[in-house]
C-alpha cells in the first residue's frame, strides 16, 4: 500500500487540512478510484472505506490485485469539521454556501481544443492523450480557496481512472446509483451486485458535480 498526502490551501494561519489517498495494486495497468463522504455528513461511506482498506491490504499481500485501486476514505475534510451543537453540517460549505458536490472544474471544451489536432485512429493513443491533457489542464488551475483546492485535488486523483466510484448515502432510500449512459455497460454488473433498485443515467446531472 502506498499512502499519499495532498495538502489543501490553508484558509487561515495556523490551520491545515489534507486529502489522504491509499494506493493498492500494480501501477501502469487499469485504475479504479473510490472516494467516500464527499457530503461529509454521509458517514456510512467512510465506514465502508475503512473495511475496504483492510480487505484491499489483504488482497495486495496475496498478489491478487490486477489493477491499481485508489481509495480516499475522507473526500471532504472541510465539511467533516463543520459541526454545530453536535449536528454535522457537511453538505454545504458554511463560508460560501456551496454544495460540496458542485462546481468542480469543467475542462471538457478546453481539453477538446488541445487534443483535436492530435487525435488519430488508435483508441489507446487517444485515451492516453486525453487523460494526459486533462491531468495537465487540472494541474494548471490555480485555487484561491481551500474548497477549490479540495475539488482540484480530488479531480487530479481521479482523472485518469477507468472506473470512478463516489460513495454517497441518504437518510431514507433504496439502494441506487447514478452513472452515464456511456458507462452503463460497465456499471450494470455492479448495480446488480449491490442490489440497486434504481439506476439513474444522465450524461450531465448538472451543477458540475463530481
Regions found by a protein language model. Give the residues of each.
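Structured catalytic-domain cores with a bias toward divalent-metal coordination
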Residues: 1-210
Amino acid at each position: 500500500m502506498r499512502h499519499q498526502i495532498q495538502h489543501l490551501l490553508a484558509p487561515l494561519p495556523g490551520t491545515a487540512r489534507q486529502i489522504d489517498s491509499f494506493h493498492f495494486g500494480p501501477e501502469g495497468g487499469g485504475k479504479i478510484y473510490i472516494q467516500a463522504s464527499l457530503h461529509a455528513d454521509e458517514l456510512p461511506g467512510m465506514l465502508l472505506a475503512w473495511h475496504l482498506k483492510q480487505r484491499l491490504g489483504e488482497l495486495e499481500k496475496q498478489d491478487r490485485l490486477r489493477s491499481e485501486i485508489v481509495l480516499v476514505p475522507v473526500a471532504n475534510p472541510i465539511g467533516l469539521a463543520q459541526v454545530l451543537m453536535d449536528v454535522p453540517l457537511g453538505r454545504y460549505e458554511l463560508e460560501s454556501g456551496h454544495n460540496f458536490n458542485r462546481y468542480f472544474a469543467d475542462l471538457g471544451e478546453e481539453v477538446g481544443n488541445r487534443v483535436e489536432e492530435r487525435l488519430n485512429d488508435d483508441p489507446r493513443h487517444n485515451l492516453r492523450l486525453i487523460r494526459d491533457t486533462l491531468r495537465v489542464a487540472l494541474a494548471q488551475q490555480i485555487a484561491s480557496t481551500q474548497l477549490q483546492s479540495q475539488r482540484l485535488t480530488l479531480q487530479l486523483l481521479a482523472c485518469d481512472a477507468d472506473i470512478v466510484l463516489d460513495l454517497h448515502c441518504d437518510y431514507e432510500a433504496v439502494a441506487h446509483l447514478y452513472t452515464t449512459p456511456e458507462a452503463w455497460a460497465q456499471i450494470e454488473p455492479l448495480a446488480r451486485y449491490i442490489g440497486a433498485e434504481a439506476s439513474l443515467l444522465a450524461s450531465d446531472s448538472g451543477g458540475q458535480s463530481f
